[in-house]
Amino acid sequence: MEEQFTNQKKVSHLQSLMNTKRSEQPTEFAKKHRFKDTLALFLVFLSFNHFTSLCLLVSFIVATKCKDFLANCFIILFLSKKPSRHIGEVAHIDISTSKVTNGSSNRKSNSRFFGNSKNSFVIPIPVLICEILFAMLLKIYGGDYFVKPIKNLAISIIASFLINDPSDCLSYATSCSVLYAVSTNTFQRVSHFFDIIQLFDMSLRGTGQSIKLFTVFRKYSQFFKKLFSLFLPMPFKMLGKHSDSMIYYLSFHILFFSFASSLLHPHRQTAENKPLKKGFNSTKPDVARVQGLQKMRISSSSSVSADSNTLEDQSPMIPNDPGGLSSSNQTIHPSQQNNSPVPLSSHSNILNPAASYPTDATSSFPYFTSMVKEYKSYQPSVISAEGSNSQAVTTTTSTTTSPTTFNFSGDNTSLSNEISLSDSSNGNSKKDSDFFSPSNDKYTNQLFELNVDFGNMFSSSKLSSDISVTSNLENFIRLLFRRKNQHLIAPLWSMVVTLKTTNFEKKYLQETSENSLTPTNSNTSYVSNQEKHDKDLDTINTHSVSSRISFTHAGKFKKSVFNNFEPSNTMALIAKTTSDDYNLLNLVSTNENIFNRNDNDYKVCIIDISTNSITFHIENLHDGELIVLVNGVIWSEVSCALILEHVGEEYVVVNGLVPSCSYDIQFINRLNHRDDYLVSDLIVRTCGNNNAIAGKFENLDFSFPSYYHRKFLSPLLTLKHSVLTTNANLSDERTKLKKTKKEFSKKLSLLRQEIDYFKGRISQNATHDEKSTLKVENLKVALQQSETAVNKLEMQLKTLTEKELELEEEYLKKKDLHLKNQLEFSKLEESLSKDLKNSEGRFQKVNQELVQLGSKLDKLNARNEKLQKEVDQNAEEIEKFSTQFLSKREKDRFRRKEYRIREANKFELTIKGLEQDINRLENENENIHSLIGNSY
């Protein structure tokens, strides 16, 4: 036995070494030939013409600056959904005001990782201006001494970035560019002496002659030129003239930012890419954490005593009391919507418990609506199942390694971290556990006691949660575009890998949809399955299905990326045991997209949880059969009750459960005896037998927390719990049986005594038999009479039923007439009500107009009175003015008359004087004429 055990150890050790060598071979091969690949790709990029090189530079800048945008595009293409929003928008977290020292780096990385992509391409204006000025100075004063090397170095950076890690990008790029420059210079100098054709002076760009290997690129460039000429506003010739300067500025931009990032953050890539050198192995903390999680994976727990476990309120880690509750430090918190965010560092505390520290009280609680009045918080620590339960049993029966993926996701966060684990072999498990002992295997679990006010249910705001089951895939796609992490492939090649994965999965789904036994995930495959299935399958034929799947289609099922159970080539997202009845079902997806949920989909509500049974309320279950699986086994102790008031609703009671135990309960609706639809998948814990409560919380088994241990809810664990409970019940029943045997022996002796007594009485009362026979004959006669009476009553009942039918017909006719009259009356009433409303509206309008006109009339009367008063005043003033004016006018006339008389007298006197002068002058004239005439 010892020799076999040692041989198994050697074989397992050799297999592990072979697997590690096989896994290291591609990485070592890639690292050996990285310089050759970069140099070859650099020469290929140098052969591009102006347009293709310009497109290459622009695409590289866009790809390096818009990483979040590219990741969101791939999420939309790969998952057919919108990308998840920032965690602060979902959980109402104020990242700027949070002061948790532990999670500051995580928050920064997450804000950079999930942040908005609007500011990712923005460059500060002063930096851009300085860059342009420096590039212009180099081009003007340096000329070709700086332009060509800058272009070559930028292209070499692109080639190196496509192949190498970000930390080694600049080293490979500079070495390739220097080697190219030295080789070209030496070749040019040697060619002058030996008259060798200068191959490097050939016009690899432009319209000259080119090498035949690169004619394909020219054809594609001409096609893209014609395509871009349709969209560019400027003519393509103008773009061709300035292409050299554009290529120079873009290459200088790439060179400037790459060297600036390497100088400003020198240890950003190297510190994370180099392995740790602490101890004899660099992976010791990771292996310790993995071993702690392996213990949780391979074991389960039954119960934890209430006396030895305590809990300190608002403390994430409790080293001494790992699983209980204390009723001393339980404070009641009033519900506040703005002061209760969830810290983003909770994931780091879960994944690395040794580095967890107590956070602020305000940042350790989730977001509640106004419907929650008060809440009490409890954070018990969780330890491994081996430390808390001595009856832990492994769930896997085979010794082969099988991967398991744990999805540690918080209540209000969309960050979900995956840790892939593998079972160790028979011999290496003990050695690994000895070498890598876990430092701290304790985790925390949040429990809340809520005081809910259902009066504010309709007025409360809806939580805008965008947490989906594809968070791990979104993280995987986003991580491919992050620059600071080291990857096996370069970040820009990750786009090609993602597209290849999607195409591979599409081909796999097309191949598997042709098989009728393959579980499908879309409506198209469901239709094809309906066409192929002509015969109904009444029950699940476990042997035939498993044999067909394992033998005939084994090659197809192992080709999928997400459904491969081999330990070397696995990427399984959910680990399932192969012995479950769940894997033998023909599951069909209800929707093409899991995010399109309708109101007509299945709904399951938990009504009651007791010690041995759980009651559910299921809606929208109209047709088919209901199959209930408990821990992967079809459960028989199930009772259903239809709700006649509501179609498609029923109550389901799952019995035969064990107290204080977690169960994975799945409801499946089978239609047409062949297609199975998953209604719901729940993990529920039954109540305990004892009523001991510490701080209004049950003494829960915290080594079995929520969804972390879904893998452990296997049929073997269910059988183990059922065996333990049946043994306990058997011991109780045996003690009860002994007691009942004693009681039955006493009762049997009493019954025998009573039988003897009654036998004596019967022998004494033999004379009473004749009297009883007479009574029987009389009763027979009475029975005949009653039968005749019953026949008569039946005839009367027939006549009455006929009359009743006639009356019902008349009643129905009258009811129809009454309904018609009611309809006519309702129509008339509606028309009259409409007319009345119209008339009332008109009447109100007329009244309003009348009121308006009355107010206008009052205003006009008041204005008329005012004007009349003004007219009277004006008339009196006019009369006074006229009298004054007439008196004044008369005085003026009298004065004028006197003045005229005076003037007339003056004029008369002057006229008389003038007449005298005229007469005198005439006389003198005559005298002169007479004198003159006498002289001649």
From Swiss-Prot:
Q: What subcellular compartments does it reside in?
A: Endoplasmic reticulum membrane
Where along the sequence do coiled-coil regions lie?
none
Where is the region Disordered? 297-351, 387-437, 512-533
Q: Does the keyword DNA-binding apply?
A: no
Q: Could you list which ranges are Lumenal topological domains?
A: 1-41, 142-245
* Record keyword Ubl conjugation present: yes
- Bilayer topology annotation: Multi-pass membrane protein
| Compositional bias of kind Polar residues | 325-351, 512-529
Name the UniProt key words of this record, in alphabetical order: Endoplasmic reticulum, Isopeptide bond, Membrane, Transmembrane, Transmembrane helix, Ubl conjugation
Primary location group: endoplasmic reticulum
Top-level taxon: Eukaryota
Please give the residue ranges for the topological domain Cytoplasmic.
63-120, 267-936
Report residues of the Glycyl lysine isopeptide (Lys-Gly) (interchain with G-Cter in ubiquitin) crosslink.
10
Which Gene Ontology cellular-component terms appear in the entry? endoplasmic reticulum; endoplasmic reticulum membrane
- Bilayer-spanning residue ranges: 42-62, 121-141, 246-266
Where does the record place Low complexity bias?
299-308, 394-405, 414-428
Q: What else is known?
A: Present with 996 molecules/cell in log phase SD medium.
Q: What is this protein called?
A: Protein NNF2
Q: Which gene encodes it?
A: NNF2
